[in-house]
Structure formats: structure tokens, C-alpha cells
Amino acid sequence: MDIQKDNRMYMQIALLTSKRSYARRLKVGCVIVKNHSIISFGWNGMPTGYDNCCEMEVDGRLVTRPEVQHAELNAIAKLAENGYSSKGAAIFITHSPCIHCALLIQKCGITDVYYHTLYRSSEGVEFLTRAGVNVTHLDVEPPFPMQPCDCRIEGCDCGGTGSVH
């Protein structure tokens, strides 16, 4: 079994999963793996019963609505709903976790975190590292063409760098 090859495949699946998000600013996907099997996946989006609009305009800027549920939360909640445990699992995320998701990841017993792109804040990675969780940047070729930002989205976080969303 080629663990590195499998890890690259899981990250590509997380990247594909991110395409399910309706977010315009940042699409995030994740996959939870335990004993070499995918046990859950998730993407960022609105709670059940809400419309699929993840952003709102505030003072002429497009900002993420506070109700948006992060990919990590959705994947972990799906496990809990079905009576499964994430203890000892690995999570593959398109973007490194925010501090709130990092706290959830650590509390749920996930031992390995792999991320493709560093989120705008490194607080989550720093917390997980201090907490003894293995954190690894895993750069893989996306299984589909990524679209560079053309900065037409009001309030885009790329700051004109043309980063990929």
C-alpha cells in the first residue's frame, strides 16, 4: 500500500468535494479517512432549510454569512449523526482549518490533518501543532482546472493576487 499515493488521492477527493459548495468567495471541501477508508466528507454551505446563498453584501463588500457551516463541521456532524467516531482518523481539507474548526478537530480525536492551501489565518494550524495533532501541507495537482480569481467579486480576499478559489 502506497500511503503517499493514497493521501494525494484523498486530497484530490476533498478538492472535488469543494465543488459542491455554493460559496462564491471560497469553496472548501474535506474528507475524513479512518483505516484507509473514507468515512465522511463535507463542504462549506448553509444549514438545511436555508437558501444556498453563502454571502451577503455589507457596505458594498461581499462577506460570508455568519450561518455558513464549515466543511469540517459538516463532515464531523455527519459522522456523529450516523453514530461513528472520528477518533484516530485523518482529515483532508482544501484549506487549513480556522481556529474554531481546529478546536473541533482536536476535540473529536482526529490525529492527522492534511491541507492543500493555507487559510488566511494560521491560528488553526498553530493550535493543532501545539495540541500534538500532526499537520501536513499536501500540495497535489487538482483533478480539474482551478479558476484563478479575476477579482470581480466584491470583497474578494485574494487582494489582487489572482489566487485560486
Where are these regions (language model features)?
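Zinc-dependent deaminase catalytic domain
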Residues: M1-H165
